[in-house]
Amino acid sequence: MSFIDPYQHIVVEHQYSHVFTVTVRKATNVTKGAIGDMLDTPDPYVELFIPSAPDCRKRTKHFNNDVNPVWNETFEFILDPNQDNVLEVTLMDANYVMDETLGMATFPISSLKLGEKKEVQLTFNNVTEMTLELSLEVCSSTDLRFSMALCDEEKKFRQQRKDNIMQSMKSFLGEENSKNLTTSRDVPVIAVLGSGGGFRAMVGFAGVMKALYESGVLDCATYIAGLSGSTWYMSTLYSHPDFPEKGPKEINQELMNSVSHNPLLLLTPQKVKRYIEALWNKKSSGQPVTFTDIFGMLIGETLIHNRMDTTLSDMKEKVSEAQCALPLFTCLHVKPDVSELMFADWVEFSPYEIGMAKYGTFMSPDLFGSKFFMGTVVKKYSENPLHFLMGVWGSAFSILFNRVLGVSNSQNKGPTMEEELENIRLKHLVSNDSSDSEDESQHPKGTENSEANEEYQNSSQESWVQRMLMALVGDSALFNTREGRAGKVHNFMLGLNLNSCYPLSPLADLLTQESVEEDELDAAVADPDEFERIYEPLDVKSKKIHIVDSGLTFNLPYPLILRPQRGVDLIISFDFSARPSDSSPPFKEILLAEKWAKMNKLPFPKIDPNVFDREGLKECYVFKPKDTSSEKDCPTIIHFVLANINFRKYKAPGLPRESKEEKDFADFDIFDDPNTPFSTFNFQYPNEAFKRLHDLMEFNTLNNLDVIKQAMMESIEYRKENPSRCSVSLSSVEARRFFNKNNLNNHT
């Protein structure tokens, strides 16, 4: 690149693993004993087992009636060099009903020297000789990227996007207003944000994106970040084969048709059978399965039913020439028995990478869900389909699935669905579960014969299908417990040595920052314990991690955009979050985002909730840094809220409504309507409800283009005065630890 990235010089510490290679050459004089040999000739195979390895059990093929088999099969194990690693070699005899153990021997792997290749002879029952070839090497390359910097693909995209944006911005602003835009270095980084809020957020964001696309604002944006419901629209848009040549107008028409049907139609016996088969295939391959998988299929069938095989990686073609803004998606990693408001790690997803900035660990999207150990893939699975990720990104709705389908007791006078979703924030969603300890090490020996195994799988599949069918009518923990509905994947940080975590603002103490008063951080927005444990590390010993909807901590994806590496100047934020009424203040989620940012030493403009008392409810609010000289890295935020104000009177900016039909169409409340057509848990939108919400947010966006233009011009000026967002010398760059094992208690 043409510039120096200081973040690439920050070292993210990690320890290298060892690769232990075993080649099973041959065996001679395989015997079942004198009596056994008289009855049958052995069908030998070899099992290799290292209890301390993550992918701990491997086996050779078997030979029928062969006492001198030659295998020449090679296997690799990834090992932690700090563990006492021992290889257990078991000679087995394959039988139809139950395989028989013929003998076992062990080899201490620590006796091998690094770089050494050694031939070893093992003896079984004083008769059988087996030849192995062993070697031990340092695994110098990993499948995780350890870095605080953006990946090279995103850096390249950003440079290309700047060049593309320059002409688009001149066209949008006009010649007079863009005269200060002389080079691509003057181009500000603009991000568009969409909140959660179920189909309400998705439909509202559809209207927003149509307005941004047709007005030219979208061509000026570098990033689009979404959370929960907004990610569903982004997924629909970016997976569409005709986007961006075909714009949101046509795609939104398809979306309206898709969401007009009852979601219960997706639970027909034929489709349920297909869901069960897909889940069985995933489970039998060794991947964890929860109801989030089913929910993702339902969302996918609704929104992208003709492209269910598409993946996140497929979106690369949409940004290959920086022709579109880079889409960013998010979910949370949460801990057992801890509220999401107290502890949550933000996981970011892009077509280039998936990872957690807090730990400086990232991977290509096709590896997410695979088995890792110490940064290396030990078992790779096919890339998860996009619909699985859509289920994870919006998993709050799978957690309350009974309420979504409307199958709860109609006479229950309990909390409303909106209140119940809010209550989830204050409780721990998942608990410690024994399934995390399941591993290959617990699999019984002697079930490797192919015919017997196939018969076993068929019977297991039948019983599992029966259990799933029972689950669909509400008789399974998979459906009836919130934990069973949270997403779960293999822990890609398993076995890493987390001596250090890294602040999302790793150079914060080297840059000019706004001082933050302690009582400002102590002030509660939603709960006294909010963010209390965000400095804690992930459990690197847990084999699986829970991933849930990011809206369970706060409902705006600011953590993705506030990473200083992205250097965002202007954020255009759209909040579709539920409020008690249409007249309620609309700042709860952005206040939580502000507090989170301050706790992570990330620049964020002061959010003054009193502006609501002074100015009342507006379509959008602008929050700027008070002093750009002392807060030079602080972005400007244009915060759009869900409000029906001018839309009641105007069908387009400056064009009044005239007919009664036009006025009746726009005369509606969002949160005060007793029929709750725009409830977070409404998964069916008749055409009129869709058009109302879609057109409202399209209007609100277009009605404030002058606000966007003004902020854009100010951002150009700011960029020109501060061409580098990271004014720090490389000589002063060093790793900035958030915590280490010795001083963790000082930060929690």
UniProtKB/Swiss-Prot annotation:
* Record-given protein name: Cytosolic phospholipase A2
- Could you tell me the superkingdom of the organism this chain comes from? Eukaryota
Biological process terms from the Gene Ontology for this record are: arachidonate metabolic process; arachidonate secretion; cellular response to antibiotic; establishment of localization in cell; glycerophospholipid catabolic process; leukotriene biosynthetic process; monoacylglycerol biosynthetic process; phosphatidylcholine acyl-chain remodeling
| Source species of the chain | Gallus gallus (Chicken)
Q: What class of enzyme is it?
A: hydrolase
Q: What does the record's free text say on domains?
A: The N-terminal C2 domain associates with lipid membranes upon calcium binding. It modulates enzyme activity by presenting the active site to its substrate in response to elevations of cytosolic Ca(2+).
Tell me where in this chain the C2 domain is found: 6-124
Region called Disordered, residue ranges: 431-459
Q: Where is the active site?
A: S228 (nucleophile), D549 (proton acceptor)
Q: Where is the PLA2c domain?
A: 138-740
Q: Which residue stretches does the UniProt record annotate as biased composition, category Polar residues? A: 449-459
- SUPFAM superfamilies hit by this protein: C2 domain (Calcium/lipid-binding domain, CaLB) (SSF49562), FabD/lysophospholipase-like (SSF52151)
Q: Where does Ca(2+) 1 bind?
A: D40, T41, D43, N65
- Region (Phospholipid binding) residue ranges read 1-178
Compartments, as annotated in UniProt: Cytoplasm; Cytoplasmic vesicle
| A GO MF label | phosphatidylinositol-3-phosphate binding
Q: Name one GO cellular component term.
A: cytoplasmic vesicle
Give the Enzyme Commission number.
Answer: 3.1.1.4, 3.1.1.5
